[in-house]
Every structure is written in structure tokens, then in C-alpha cells.
Amino acid sequence: VATVDCSDYPKPACTMEYMPLCGSDNKTYGNKCNFCNAVVDSNGTLTLSHFGKC
């Protein structure tokens, strides 16, 4: 199972770097920061499906 450490999130701003991750909601997140902010917003219900685009 792929995991991402989101312990240092949420962050107020994310960089524009593109390193896509696919969430358990079948949505592609542009990078770890965007994904981790969404994980925090979801109260931990969002998980990583896999690295790369969905």
C-alpha cells in the first residue's frame, strides 16, 4: 500500500510542482501538498490510491 506522510500539513500555500498522486476519491492531485491538504480537510477519510494520475 502506498502511503504519504501528511504530518506536517495542512499548509497555507502549495508550490506548483507537478508530481501527481491519485486519491481514494479517484481524483488526481497535482502534488503531495495539494493531496495532504485534502486529506486534512477530509478528516483522514481520503487516502492515497497510488502515485501518478488516476
From Swiss-Prot:
Known Pfam families for this protein? Kazal_1
Cellular-component GO terms for this entry? extracellular region
Origin, by domain of life? Eukaryota
User: Which UniProt keywords are given for this protein, alphabetically ordered?
Assistant: Disulfide bond, Glycoprotein, Protease inhibitor, Repeat, Secreted, Serine protease inhibitor
Q: Which residues form the Kazal-like domain?
A: 4-54
Where this protein primarily resides, as one coarse class? secreted
Cell compartments where the protein resides: Secreted
- Glycosylated positions are N43
Q: Where is this site: Reactive bond 3?
A: M16, E17
InterPro entries, alphabetized: Bifunctional_prot_inhibitor, Kazal_dom, Kazal_dom_sf, Prot_inh_Kazal-m
From the record, give the cysteines joined by S-S bonds: C6-C36, C14-C33, C22-C54
Which CDD domains does the record match to this protein? KAZAL_FS
GO MF entry, a single one: serine-type endopeptidase inhibitor activity
What the entry lists under SUPFAM superfamilies is as follows: Kazal-type serine protease inhibitors
Return the domain comment text from this UniProt entry.
Avian ovomucoid consists of three homologous, tandem Kazal family inhibitory domains.
Q: What is this protein called?
A: Ovomucoid
